[in-house]
A protein has these predicted regions:
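Sec-dependent signal peptide recognition
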Residues: 1-4
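C-terminal motif of bacterial Sec signal peptides marking the signal peptidase cleavage site
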Residues: 10-13
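Bacterial signal peptide processing site
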Residues: 15-17
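Core segments of small alpha/beta cavity-forming domains
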Residues: 20-93
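A short linear-motif detector with a strong N-terminal bias
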Residues: 82-83, 98-102, 121-123, 131-133
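A short, amphipathic edge element
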Residues: 92-112
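Exposed beta-sheet edge and beta->alpha loop/turn motif
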Residues: 110-168
Length: 168
């Protein structure tokens, strides 16, 4: 039974069509921003969810590692920004009422050097008011873990906003 599940995980991890890429980027962004909402309610503390089971057998670990290697192509800045815009996940309902727009900068997603098989992403979000002035910046870090082709965990860190002084 385990061999069948592993074979299915390997097969599903090999799909590289555009729908699959979009779905993976969407899963990544959705889980991350759900986490951001939790972090906002916990005074920006690091919030950890249950980690991937460390007792997986060697074959399963190889499968997961291969999948992580494949995931690098799924997590791109363009896909994340498109998903954020589609879902309005950085709209004013999550932040101060004077925020009317945002921009994402310094996006980077790489295989984690701290956790085998994980992907780490970092980026900054600058918040803009209705006068088109940049009023605050927040930096984000996230680590995502997968089991086969399904994201099973994510945890992150949100740093407090940095006010941007206005030149008058």
């Amino acid at each position: 039974m385990t061999a069948i599940l592993i074979a299915l995980m390997i097969f599903s991890g090999c799909k590289t069509n555009e729908d699959t890429k979009s779905k993976k980027a969407e899963e990544f962004a959705n889980l991350f921003f759900e986490q951001v909402k939790v972090l906002q309610k916990t005074d920006n503390r690091i919030f950890n969810l249950e980690e991937l089971n460390d007792n997986a057998d060697d074959e399963a670990k190889k499968t997961v590692k291969k999948y992580y290697d494949d995931m690098r192509e799924y997590i791109s800045e363009e896909q994340l920004i498109k998903y954020l815009n589609d879902q309005e996940l950085l709209s004013t309902k999550y932040y101060e009422s004077n925020v009317t727009d945002y921009k994402i900068e310094n996006f980077k997603a790489v295989p984690s050097d701290k956790k085998e098989g994980a992907i780490d992403a970092t980026f900054d979000v600058t918040f803009i008011n209705d006068s088109k002035a940049e009023i605050a910046k927040k930096s984000y870090k996230i680590r995502c873990m997968f089991d086969g082709d399904k994201m099973v965990d994510a945890f992150g860190e949100m740093f407090p906003p940095t006010e941007i002084s206005q030149n008058k």
